């Protein structure tokens, strides 16, 4: 990051830069004094996060009268979500990543079950975090081929390449002294989204912010899209269409 240190440092304070990280006090929206208890009334399970030094844990328990009839503690390894709206929580066992049944809504300072866990659908600690989810909420990870939710390495936060494309060629050319006056010319060793045609600019954002059902093209994966491509080269995104409804959903 030596070439663009100020830009990088500024970017890391944005929602995308804070999108995914270890669940430590530095990166979590949960504080020592703000750890809301939640209750799944259908399955009669309570969830209470707590800190132990700089590690975050989630306690699941069930009560019958004054007796505790069930108790399970799991360490939270990652927080997902910048904290602008939410922090959700993940744990990892031997590279396999699952979501935990606890989401903190930062603006209202309340906690609840994550979306999809409500109304009796609380899968507790078994929801797998697949590559479609991980590849939008984080930089592209090293995903184990053939696995749903096993990762050989997991980055921390959406990186520069998500909007600017692979940077290896760009770095090599700059280190070799090939400097372009970008006030006059386009530097084709890296993608500047501002210089893309409008439809390709939208495709960079719509890769993750268009809320629909993504269907991959044959032979493609969720990590194949690169800025400057047409999104349709990698996937088609289908949106629900309602009668007399002209709007579509974009994720914030």
Language-model region placement:
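Domain-scale recognition of modular recruitment/scaffold domains used in eukaryotic signaling
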Residues: 95, 106-110
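Residue-level signal for beta-strand positions within conserved beta-sheet cores that form or flank
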Residues: 98
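Primarily the internal scaffold of c-type cytochrome electron-transfer domains
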Residues: 5-82, 88-93, 101, 112-118, ...
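Well-ordered mid-protein domain cores that form the structural environment of catalytic cofactors
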Residues: 109-140
């Amino acid at each position: 990051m030596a070439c663009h240190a100020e830009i990088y440092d500024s970017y890391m304070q944005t929602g995308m830069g804070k999108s995914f990280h270890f669940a430590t006090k530095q990166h979590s929206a949960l504080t020592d004094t703000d750890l809301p208890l939640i209750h799944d009334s259908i399955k009669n399970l309570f969830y209470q996060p707590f800190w132990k030094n700089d590690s975050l844990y989630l306690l699941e328990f069930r009560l019958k009268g004054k007796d505790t009839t069930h108790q399970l503690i799991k360490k939270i390894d990652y927080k997902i979500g910048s904290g602008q709206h939410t922090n959700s929580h993940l744990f990892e066992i031997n590279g396999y990543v699952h979501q935990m049944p606890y989401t903190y809504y930062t603006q209202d300072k309340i906690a609840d079950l994550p979306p999809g866990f409500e109304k009796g659908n609380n899968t507790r600690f078994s929801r797998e975090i697949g590559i479609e989810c991980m590849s939008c909420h984080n930089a592209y990870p090293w995903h184990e081929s053939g696995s749903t939710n096993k990762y050989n390495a997991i980055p921390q936060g959406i990186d520069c390449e998500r909007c600017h494309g692979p940077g290896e060629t760009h770095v090599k050319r700059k280190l070799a002294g090939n400097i372009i006056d970008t006030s006059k010319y386009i530097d084709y060793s890296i993608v500047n989204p501002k210089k893309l045609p409008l439809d390709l600019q939208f495709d960079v954002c719509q890769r993750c912010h268009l809320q629909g059902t993504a269907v991959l093209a044959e032979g493609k994966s969720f990590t194949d899209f690169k800025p400057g491509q047409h999104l349709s080269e990698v996937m088609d995104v289908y949106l629900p269409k309602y009668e007399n409804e002209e709007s579509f959903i974009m994720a914030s």
